[in-house]
Regions:
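Catalytic domains of riboflavin
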Residues: 23, 186-188
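Extended, domain-scale alpha-helical bundle/helix-rich regions
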Residues: 170, 176-180
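ATP-dependent carboxylate activation and anion-phosphoryl transfer catalytic cores
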Residues: 1-163, 170-171, 195-199, 228, ...
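Conserved hydrophobic/aromatic pocket- or pore-lining residues that grip, position, or stack substrates
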Residues: 130, 177, 240
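Residue-level "edge-of-site" marker
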Residues: 133-135, 144, 180, 191, ...
Length: 242
């Protein structure tokens, strides 16, 4: 939904019914069949002397957006897109920490608190206690708990195609699945391909007018909406937040 364009037209006096949007008008109420998660990108890897405790001061230099069919998929897509070398809600430094130290850490509200929170959930710590310590909405904590539950399923079922398919639908990367199955990323990729577990591209269509909108996101659920053409194409490569 082109918020900026619609807002500008409203500002010059146009009514919603007069503003065309994707084959309809801006008066049509948007209907969503996807979820979006945004994660801030903090540059503490470049500014190593900066304090990474978060507060009211702006410290992020950008953000990433993960689009998916479920909250878990959005979380994991976003984490991978941060370009911090992390491919999952997992950091070894937190895996090595005692539980009481993790509880102390999550009350300090740092840029990587979400990874410490995930480690506590991975250890079966109470979501209610974690919520009380961080005030993170339980909806998000429960999504992380489902990610941790899928980790357990994968560990208990190495090379299992059903588990692999379920993990991909939840947003797991081949690289992290490989680490749980003590193999390499390419082996997981080949296993997926051999069993027809490949992503589709779904359309971001909020108005459902039937018009094709070339705004797509990948997912392992649903039907493919991408239309291939013979037109010339370009790839725009972005750098990082700095």
């Amino acid at each position: 939904y082109p918020i900026a364009r619609v807002t500008a037209k409203i500002a010059v006096g146009m009514a919603l019914e007069e503003i065309p949007v994707a084959g309809g008008t801006a008066a049509i109420e948007p209907s969503l069949d996807y979820i979006v998660a945004k994660f801030p990108r903090f540059p503490f890897d470049k500014f190593t002397t900066a304090k990474n405790t978060l507060g009211t001061q702006m410290k992020a230099t950008g953000e990433v957006m993960g689009i998916g069919s479920c909250l878990e998929e959005c979380f994991l897509k976003s984490v991978r897109s941060l370009e911090t070398g992390v491919t999952h809600l997992y950091m070894k430094k937190f895996a090595d920490m005692p539980t009481h130290t993790l509880y102390e850490y999550i009350t300090e509200f740092k840029d990587d608190t979400i990874f410490a929170v995930t480690e506590l959930i991975r250890r079966k710590e109470s979501i209610a206690e974690i919520h009380a310590a961080t005030m993170i909405t339980e909806l998000f904590l429960e999504a992380i708990a489902r990610i941790c539950k899928m980790e357990e399923l994968l560990k208990a079922n190495p090379q299992d195609i059903v588990a692999l398919n379920a993990a991909k639908r939840l947003g797991f990367s081949d690289k992290y699945i490989a680490s749980l199955w003590n193999t390499d990323e390419l082996s997981i990729y080949n296993l997926r391909k051999q069993n027809g577990i490949t992503p589709v591209f779904k359309m971001v269509d909020t108005l459902h007018t039937g018009k094709y909108i070339a705004y797509l996101y990948s997912s392992y659920t649903g039907e493919n909406a991408s239309r291939l053409t013979d037109k010339k194409k370009i790839v725009v490569l972005g750098a990082g937040p700095i």
